[in-house]
Amino acid sequence: MVAFAHLPHFHVVGFTGHRRLADAPGVAGAIREAIEMLRREGPGEWIGLSSAAAGSDTLFAREALAQGCAWHVLLPLPEAEFKRDFSEDEWREAEELLARAEQVRVFNETEAREDAYLDAGMETVHGADIVLAVWDGEPARGKGGTADVIAYARDVGRPLVIIDVQTLVIRRENGTAFAAHDHDLEYFNSLPEAPPAGGAANPFGAPGEILAFQRKVDHKASRGAPQFRRLIASTTILHVLATLVAAAGLAFALHAAILPWMKLFCLDGALAVALLLRKQGAHHHWVRCRLAAEFCRSALATWGLPRNALIFAELDLPGMRLLVRALQVMHQRSAGAKPVAMEDFKRLYVTHRIDDQLAYYERRLGQAMPQLVWLRSGFWMATLAAITCTAAYALHRVWNYAEIPLGLEEWLFYFLPISLPVMAAALISLISINDLHRRVARYREMCAVLQAARKQIAYGRTWSSLERVVQQTERALLQEVIEWHSITSFAESH
């Protein structure tokens, strides 16, 4: 059966509300109405995100689960500490609900109690697309109360749905900020299918739609890779050629009609390339597809972990949020469905991820290093030759020590002193344009990181230790393309 190469759309509604309620059934009905309203507005699956405190949190959890939403729990404290805020009956109800949660995460295990509640509330806002609140309109009675969470949501521009505790009226704030559709994920999903060959390996049997999705965004990135470095280098080379044409005309007293046209052709070509660089939108699309492909490659390589390792937990990139969320939720739901023995995981991960990436970085290092050596050597040779020609000209003008043939004099004293510094400047600029120093250092660093990870995995004896190494490795592998994403998302290329 052929898998569809698209990923599902997951919306998250965060929740905050009071513990003590005068009309709990009425509040429950208002919560139900608000969730139904959101589900009508946003296609795809909805996930509820909240704590599990008595009162409003419990009502929200029951209503979300009753409507078929998954429930993700963010506890401000470890369960043993969190339990102290409940009566026996309240905790019995909370335990029953926690058993139905798809995910339970303790956000903070070290802070003071009120600080922990505030941090958990802020994290709920951060992880949500829209925040649903049950609020009496009054200031918070302690740090981390509902009013504090609402204030934070307002400050960061998160859309709010507020249920008034007294009147049960539902009102909205900043509603236009809620994106029912994610254009980036829709763009990825709309890409045509890729040829069956190519793409990432799937050693742990991840869902077919993720593999198909990875192949098509990887195919798009590979076919649409922009040639911006080559274009920038071509502007430099065209300017150098224009300078050499002008220098030749002056040095050799050439007055051929073709020379001004040659220089004009070079300068017009450089201008055309510069304009092309400003108009080129392929760079941003390429980076988006490349980043999406690498996120999926990382997910496929780590699918065999028995627990839901939060590899992407700290990443919140513009345009990638729903893609990362889809991968995280799908991984979480399948974690442990097909258990993989530890030694099998180590062998497959090393073979299909570590060794594959190590070979890639070694290959790229082998390509970049000769370019760096050649350009650096060319710069020094051109610079030293320019100094030699200029010094010879200066000495000749002072002492006139020998008669020099006219042809040699034109080359040695006029053409080369002008052209060689320009060529040296072009060669050193090509090193920067091609980012060779950083790339060589990056490739060497990644080879060292991967070799160290290989050894750590070989000696790993527990899943916890393996998860730590895998998380560090995957984040290091993603760092390069994340940097490119930042450049193209927040800076204009000139």
Language-model features: locations:
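Acidic/glycine-enriched connector segments
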Residues: 1-172
